[in-house]
Amino acid sequence: MPGDNDIVLVDSSSDNEEEREEDDDDESQHREIKKFKPNPNPSQTRDMNESHVINKSNFSTVPFNAVSSSSSSDNDQDNDEEEEEEEEEEEEEEEEEEEEEEEEEEEEEEEEEESEINGNQISLSIDDEYDSEGLTKESSRTPIGSNTSDIIINGVTIITNNNDSSLVASSSDDDDDDDDDDDKDDDNDDDASDLESDFAFEEIPPSLIMETRKYLKQNGTMKFLEKYLPTAASIENIIKLILQLGFVPKRKLNNGLDENDIMEYIKILNHAIIKVKSIRERREDITTINDALKLIENSKNIMVITGAGISTSLGIPDFRSSQGFYSMIQHLGLSDPQEVFDLDLFLNDPNIFYSIAHMILPPNHIYSPLHSFIKLLQDKNKLLRNYTQNIDNLESYAGIHKENLIQCHGSFATASCITCGYKVDGEIIFPEIKNKEIPYCPKCNEVKQSILKKGKKTKSKSKKKKKKKNKPYDDDDEEEEEGETYFHESFGVMKPDITFFGEQLPENFKIAINQDINKVDLVLVIGTSLKVAPVADIVGKIPEHIPQILLNKDPINHCQFDVSLLGYCDDVASYIANELGESWDLPHPDYNKIRGEKNGENLSVQLLDSTLREYLISNKKNDLSSEQEQNKMGEENRKVEESGRRPNESGGKSG
């Protein structure tokens, strides 16, 4: 088996598709591997500031079962001889098995397609976690031996020792079967991803990143390393290649250029290679905004994925921006603002949630022009499904049919009693939410009053340990406290049917997505950063040939959209509708105000980046408003300066 310091790349791809379908025993004999090991004597190669280097002449290509824990050059030579003998035997076996493999080929391909659809070995299950940074998942994992595990992507298997988890763990896999919201799980995961997507560095332009990634995907890992790493590869070479793949290591090593750093950066490079292989490749025939418009006009089964950005124009805050909901509740003193949506915390003290729930309460029966755009797709029989992360239920106000809508995180549409399950229309508890009061279940309240009428003394008590549902009081406490009845703090509390951390996802999500990935012909991602599972992993489940278009205020670097239309969601939707003609006029009262009365005079488009295919949709009206606001602020600052005070002193408070 590989030594503790060895990183082994296994190329399980081959010219014949049948070779990939052999059973595990044969596969272990036929796989080709490339072993990365630091050069034990760097003085024999070129000296680079006396740093350790990786000599590619020490990389051995041998059958996996011939790799020993010692990795000496003598063993490598012996392994090469064994490889030649085994290759001859393999050729004879392949000739004998060729006819049988051809007969089985159709059946195997059908099984592979079914596996991809169902999210089994080849593709990820929709329940699998993605890391908290929103980076796409690399692959599932399959055991190779008792001491190793492998990661399979596009026919290339990367193997590491189980006792070295830095590379494997960076995949952020969680093998649990629960359906809890993955975002919180990932935030608490100690094995966080060691890479972050970043196109901001000046040294490497996006065009070179795209070229490097394309070569890797088209030619495989072995040829990629031969082309992009020199014969004696140093740490500098490895780091440069990581950057050239479009990633920056999250953590910097402090040990200088010693052997430990070399091995660590090799692992990070391996991780980058895996990620690139998992990223969707942009289609070469869809590159311009006109291509995007034609797709929207002609597609018949459009999947729309939406987030908080489609509702911010109505005054509903997003969650993660500097002025978003989580920033607004810092005063609660929670270790993590997301805890307001933690089920255990809600059961122990529902007051915390209801003290801030009014801030995210949806407005009464209004919706944005972007919601009208989705409704228009539905009216034209083009909407396959709208998968929304929003809990405001504004889609229903816009007229989107229930069968065309999946509310992935639940919504305020209904509310349920956490004790007896009694369900009501969500708007019934809106008055209590607006008043920062806890709404209670009428049925459980009757039970409570009935107990009180029996003359028993009642006392509200909050406990850390969650009580069972349908149990109005604790019998043990009653006996211990001489007849006193203790009601749990959350007894009979009504809770909006929002999916809290600790609750299962809506069942209709799983059913719908497994159907829709086989029907969709266009994906529109609108108003979301795609950082929260399960919605974040949908784009990775869609077949690569299906076009993907982004409509968002900011670009998303960890996904490869064919075209990105950047700007405020209402402006982008209005631009699309205006360009497609009168039959696409949005059924919203603000549509003409946004686009301008004279055929879209307020809206303009600008190409930002031809390589990334990013376009900016801007609105003159918004620009004028911003300019007026800036002028107003500038005038106020000038008045403050003339009065001899600094701006932050104007309120009488010292900075």
UniProtKB/Swiss-Prot annotation:
Binds 1 zinc ion per subunit. NAD(+) binds at residues 307-326, 389-392, 527-529, 552-554, 569. One of its GO terms (molecular function) is histone H4K16 deacetylase activity, NAD-dependent. Its cofactor is Zn(2+). The keyword Transit peptide does not apply. Residues 42-67 have a biased composition (Polar residues). Zn(2+) binds at C417, C420, C441, C444. The keyword Nucleus applies. It is found in: Nucleus. InterPro entries: DHS-like_NAD/FAD-binding_dom, NAD-dep_histone_deAcase_SIR2_N, NAD-dep_sirtuin_deacylases, Sirtuin, Sirtuin_cat_small_dom_sf, Ssirtuin_cat_dom. Residues 455-470 have a biased composition (Basic residues). The active site is at H409 (proton acceptor). Residues 620-648 have a biased composition (Basic and acidic residues). Residues 14-27, 75-116, 172-201 have a biased composition (Acidic residues). GO terms for cellular component: nucleus. Residues 1-148, 164-201, 455-482, 619-655 are annotated as: Disordered. Keywords: Metal-binding, NAD, Nucleus, Repressor, Transcription, Transcription regulation, Transferase, Zinc. Disulfide bonds: none annotated. Residues 282-583 form the Deacetylase sirtuin-type domain. It catalyses: N(6)-acetyl-L-lysyl-[protein] + NAD(+) + H2O = 2''-O-acetyl-ADP-D-ribose + nicotinamide + L-lysyl-[protein]. One of its GO terms (biological process) is heterochromatin formation. PANTHER family: NAD-DEPENDENT PROTEIN DEACETYLASE SIRTUIN-1 (PTHR11085:SF9), NAD-DEPENDENT PROTEIN DEACYLASE SIRTUIN-5, MITOCHONDRIAL-RELATED (PTHR11085). Belongs to the sirtuin family. Class I subfamily. NAD-dependent histone deacetylase, which could function in telomeric silencing, cell cycle progression and chromosome stability. This is NAD-dependent protein deacetylase HST1. It comes from Candida albicans (strain SC5314 / ATCC MYA-2876).
